[in-house]
Amino acid sequence: MALDIHAHRILILDFGSQYTQLIARRVREIGVYCELHPFDMDDEAIREFAPKGVILAGGPESVHEANSPRCPQAVFDLGVPVFGICYGMQTMAEQLGGKVAGSELREFGYARVDVVGKSRLLDGIEDHIDADGLFGLDVWMSHGDKVTKLPEDFHILASTPSCPIAGMADDARGYYGVQFHPEVTHTKQGGRILSRFILDICGCEALWTPSKIAEDAIAQVRAQVGTDNVLLGLSGGVDSSVVAALLHKAIGDQLTCVFVDNGLLRLHEGEQVMAMFAENMGVKVIRANAEEQFLNNLEGESDPEKKRKIIGRTFIDVFDAESCKLDNIKYLAQGTIYPDVIESAGAKSGKAHVIKSHHNVGGLPEEMNLKLVEPLRELFKDEVRRLGLELGLPYDMVYRHPFPGPGLGVRILGEVKKEYADLLRRADHIFIEELRKADWYHKVSQAFVVFQPVKSVGVVGDGRRYAWVVALRAVETIDFMTARWAHLPYELLETVSGRIINEIEGISRVTYDVSSKPPATIEWE
């Protein structure tokens, strides 16, 4: 009988915290499957999910205010361990008979908590011991309210000068709460604390590993698809590449990929995709050379949103035309990943309960009448990358920087022209090449060049040159929700600028974007 890698599972209830997805990623990293659901998940659904433990995440509300979110009673009726984090601790305390109040002194940022009580959760976990033999932890706080009275059978686990009950425990029931955030890297022992709860207290086994995920996904695809044929839009991005590798391993020649070359790809990207999948792996790939069609449709349009829509519609037209040439296609494969599913479910707000299919291909015509196969829909991006490596995809492909769906179309400001795209892809190639040489490519989260439809005077030899301006953009980020501009060495910027201006005749000036997000976005359009 095949191993069920979902058998040991953790339920995470979302109360609106910006860190909730991070909790789920940390649980997965420990090797245990988990799912994220809104705080008002139906009682019957909770029982059917049958978790080995429950984590109550944080949130921006105040427990003592009217109509603030509450944990379903079914969670406390399950008889499994429960771990409340920040707001999760507060609502647990209040619902089990304790009290919560606003605090005059709010705690945001780094803090030290003293471990003042023994418990299965924190015993043996510390960052330092003071002269009095008191254990301390360096943690990240983000709260205004605090627990002022413990529920019955709980004892104080940790405290700070402004928050005497910074942690609480009821070892008999396996109920724990902490006011700090163990899921963020700023809490140095956070990983150990979560591991202690999940592996030791909940008794979960680490079944969620890349090799087991690959085996499970292959088995699931074979069971779903049977002998039918599957169509995949292959973009060369991480998600579609991993789907292609996975499906090829699962069903071989039953898979056909359509690679739409829109003329807005990176330098040599089309050739690289064909070499990797068609030549090296033996995947059936149809390359649709549609550069002229895309550029004709984009002619004269400079509005960013309209450009995106034109590119999306043209992709659908090309993809549909190619798929009509194929016989007996029953399934459409998509690279939907777990954050897409969460977003579609509205988990952050808790307002939506139905998880809808996330059509990341972009609204394919309903008359195609194909059933969906989405083998990555349970995985976070970092898990997709690890799965890609497990399936034999090259590291450089799996860990490439994100590339927007509309491609260079949104990195060319204003109207898109072939001349601009050709100049931009060469400049971008130089930038990425030099980042790799200087060992900076994997130190930044995303790097690219933006073409500006502005001309500037330059000097080449004894003559003047009136040519285009480009901007370099490199950012560092954890979640792409916020980002800071990367402080690249001046010598590296000088090398990149010199190469672009000297090697590309149509460019006379290179600038560096020092805008962070917010207020700027990462992409310019």
From Swiss-Prot:
Domain GMPS ATP-PPase: 208-400
Domain Glutamine amidotransferase type-1 as annotated: residue spans: 9-207
Keyword terms of this UniProt record: ATP-binding, Glutamine amidotransferase, GMP biosynthesis, Ligase, Nucleotide-binding, Purine biosynthesis
The protein's annotated pathway: Purine metabolism; GMP biosynthesis; GMP from XMP (L-Gln route): step 1/1
Annotated positions binding ATP: 235-241
Key word Cell membrane present: no
Protein name: GMP synthase [glutamine-hydrolyzing]
